[in-house]
């Protein structure tokens, strides 16, 4: 007894759509090789290291001028003008007088210092960068420099603003 062979069926060819062109690779304009020094301040942040990074860009870039507040390349600031401008770039307001800046923020001990804290002296102020060092507007001869916290004077206080 033979059965009639089943009709051969071919699977239907899959429906195809025309191939979409491959997406073009995303390209971005090349970033400039050099950027202005110092770079603009980032948005306000609670990170003391961001304050240090911004402050360090001014080393050798701005002159010391007693009473100065012009923190620009080739401009002039004094110690409190420097700290006032650096913190202002992060939305923190300080007066232009080192004797008043010691009243801002929270008092901390030397052992508690973190990058971004103020180092306050009688008649002077700087920003702690870590490792027992600070950045500050030192003098007309030296400008904005990095020094040991105990470079010339005994600090009278340490303040945390962030």
Residue ranges and their predicted role:
Residues 116-121:
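Short beta-strand segments that buttress and anchor functional surface loops
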């Amino acid at each position: 007894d033979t059965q009639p062979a089943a009709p051969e069926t071919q699977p239907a060819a899959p429906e195809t759509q025309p191939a979409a062109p491959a997406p073009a690779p995303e390209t971005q304009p090349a970033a400039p090789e050099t950027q202005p020094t110092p770079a603009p301040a980032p948005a306000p942040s609670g990170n003391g290291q961001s304050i240090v990074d911004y402050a360090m860009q001014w080393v050798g870039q701005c002159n010391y001028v007693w009473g100065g507040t012009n923190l620009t390349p080739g401009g002039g600031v004094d110690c409190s003008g420097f700290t006032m401008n650096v913190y202002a770039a992060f939305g923190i307001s300080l007066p232009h007088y080192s004797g008043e800046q010691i009243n801002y923020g929270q008092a901390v001990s030397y052992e508690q210092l973190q990058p971004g804290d103020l180092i306050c002296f009688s008649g002077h102020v700087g920003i702690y960068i870590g490792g027992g060092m600070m950045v500050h507007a030192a003098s007309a001869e030296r400008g904005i420099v990095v020094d040991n916290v105990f470079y010339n004077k005994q600090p009278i206080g340490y303040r945390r603003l962030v």
